Amino acid sequence: MTTPSPALSDLHAFLTGAPTSRPVVWVAAGRRPAPDDLPEDALVIAAEELETAPGQELLLREGELDADCEQIVVADALEISVMDYVLASYLPCTGPTLLRLAGDADWDAFLEDADDAVATGYVPDHLLSPLVLLEDAWPLASGDLPAGRCTLTADGASPCLPGAPSPLGRDTGGRPWLPRYLTLVAALRSVRTRDARDVVVSGLGARLGEHAPAELTEDARTAVILRTQDGYRCLLPDTGRFLSLPEQLALLLELVLTLGPDTETLAERTGLSPEQVRAAMSALEEAGILGQAALV
């Protein structure tokens, strides 16, 4: 039996907290909701056969995602290992793996990895593997729990994954840049599937130009600028678009994102004339880059 692709995509989104095209409901063992108790177009992930209404889809699983869960099996076909984040540095993730941030030690290890990545540019392999899913990566980057996610247990309904509250509610310890960090990591993981050679991401251990401040000050979902061996690239997180940029335009964009769009300041930092700066910013606007950054 193979797992339907749309259902697999929605399961992926359920685990990471990403938006889905339909409601996704995880039904804990022992709960037997009636079809009328579920959204009319829901994907229902359950451990046993349940009655569903037209428009609803049932996806059978083994495993409960509780504190002792080490694996879930979906549709008798897809095996997903479940691992505490703190263990990921010691145990290789050789197949589909959900990294959970349920415990204090997991959260502390996650924050330490974030500090190291922002300071040095080193991102752990387990965050760059396309096989690895980080619990609630999307809410941690966006600040919002997904509206379409629901877990039904004996205690009622919750928008969090089974087994623990969302890490979104945890103390970041004075790291307002954490959402931006997750956006940068996602961009680096995406570009590494295209080009495994050395990639430098603006904001992860380095800036691409000498005049940009080192601190992560950009909004979480603004454009991500990268330097690869093939040149400068720009990723628009909300659309997934990759664009090639000339060096001068890429470095100007980095300054706009970190310092703001003041023409005089940008001209002073770059050595360009105000007219040249305005022309370059117009080109970035026309490409949809600054529009996404909400700087115009």
Task: Identify the role of each PLM range.
Residues 1-44, 97-98, 176-202, 244-296:
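Long, charge-rich, low-complexity alpha-helical segments
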Residues 28, 61, 126-130, 152-153, ...:
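Acidic/polar residues at beta-strand termini and the immediately following turn/coil
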Residues 43-46, 59:
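Short, well-structured secondary-structure segments
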Residues 50, 55, 62-146:
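Radical SAM enzyme [4Fe-4S]-AdoMet core and its adjacent flexible, acidic
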Residues 118-132, 161-209:
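C-terminal accessory region of radical SAM enzymes
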Residues 143, 147-163, 235:
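Active-site and channel-lining beta-strand-loop segments
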Residues 188-251:
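Acidic, low-complexity/disordered tracts enriched in E/D and polar residues
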